[in-house]
Amino acid sequence: DVKNNPGNTADLVVLEKILTQKLTRLFAGWSSSGSQIRSGTLIVQPKIIKIRIVGPFTRIVVGSLAGQSSIVIDLMLTDSSTGGVIANPRIKKNSGAWAGGWSFGLSDRNLHEYVAHIARQYFINNYR
């Protein structure tokens, strides 16, 4: 789905940027706190499984008939010293067609932010 649609490129760049910003800030904060609760290096490899974002023009003209927007990513978390996979959570988030229509596409455009926030919260809940 991702590779077959060249229109996804811009959305991939946006998602990567937001995800990198949120996780980099989180990990930097943990490093600067001096906490030795965990040691070692965690490798985070996000893999986009599906991305479909209805554009603002389409959403305004067609409304809910344009369908829903959705993002599905896998986050493979690997211990760098052992190479063992620690976890591989899947994050799925969608913006319903009616929500997109009523918000004039705002819920579609915010989907990248929602997914990055869920990923950040996953680390806070499981690795702090």
Give the ranges of each region predicted by the language model.
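Surface-exposed short loop/turn segments
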Residues: 29-85, 95-106
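Compositionally biased, intrinsically disordered linkers/stalks adjacent to structured regions
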Residues: 96-97, 101-128
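Solvent-exposed, acidic/flexible segments
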Residues: 8-20, 64, 68, 105-116
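A structural "domain/chain start" motif
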Residues: 1-21, 25, 54, 88-92, ...
